[in-house]
Amino acid sequence: MQSYASAMLSVFNSDDYSPGVQQNIPALRRSSSFLCTESYNSKYQRETGENSKDSVQDRVKRPMNAFFVWSRDQRRKMALENPRMRNSEISKQLGYQWKMLTAAEKWPFFQEAQKLQAMHREKYPNYKYRPRRKANMLPKNCSLLPADPASVLCSEVQLDNRLYRDDCTKATHSTMEHQLGHLPPINAASSPQQRDRCSHWTKL
């Protein structure tokens, strides 16, 4: 399958800018992305032993700590009061507010967190915390989809331009040698015009 960067490069180098050619480029990018993501998901399932979506959904969650017990209602309240605020900004504000609370203010939430942990141990006695790997991170050795198609495209264009310049230099040098080989030999009896013409070709 032709890569996205190769397709873009072929359109860039050609004069065919028809809608049919341009329409195929997003399809190539989606196909490459799908193949790379599918390959990574298969590898992730083999390493973790997960063979279906149900196993991911049935994963046991960690019990909430004191901060999450406190921020559960605070986050909902802040989101309602600031509907345009991003979730990351809400998390920052909640973290700052939690640090400003006194030990006495935090104590009820620590007690609630201890109760939740006790219930969790009773319900899942064999539970072991396993950090979940980020599914949106692609492996470094994935060559089906470039990390930055624009950078790859620019690299290929620069490479082609460099090769083109090298070919032009070689062709010009070969043409000059051929033309210089047919020049008459320079002697003392040559006219000034002939000497100037030979000097011009030598400088080139």
UniProtKB/Swiss-Prot annotation:
Source superkingdom: Eukaryota
GO cellular component: cytoplasm; nuclear speck; nucleus
SUPFAM superfamilies, per database record: HMG-box
One of the GO biological process terms: male sex determination
Function: Transcriptional regulator that controls a genetic switch in male development. It is necessary and sufficient for initiating male sex determination by directing the development of supporting cell precursors (pre-Sertoli cells) as Sertoli rather than granulosa cells. Involved in different aspects of gene regulation including promoter activation or repression. Binds to the DNA consensus sequence 5'-[AT]AACAA[AT]-3'. SRY HMG box recognizes DNA by partial intercalation in the minor groove and promotes DNA bending. Also involved in pre-mRNA splicing.
Family: Belongs to the SRY family.
Subunit structure: Interacts with CALM, EP300, HDAC3, KPNB1, ZNF208 isoform KRAB-O, PARP1, SLC9A3R2 and WT1. The interaction with EP300 modulates its DNA-binding activity. The interaction with KPNB1 is sensitive to dissociation by Ran in the GTP-bound form. Interaction with PARP1 impaired its DNA-binding activity.
Name recorded for this polypeptide: Sex-determining region Y protein
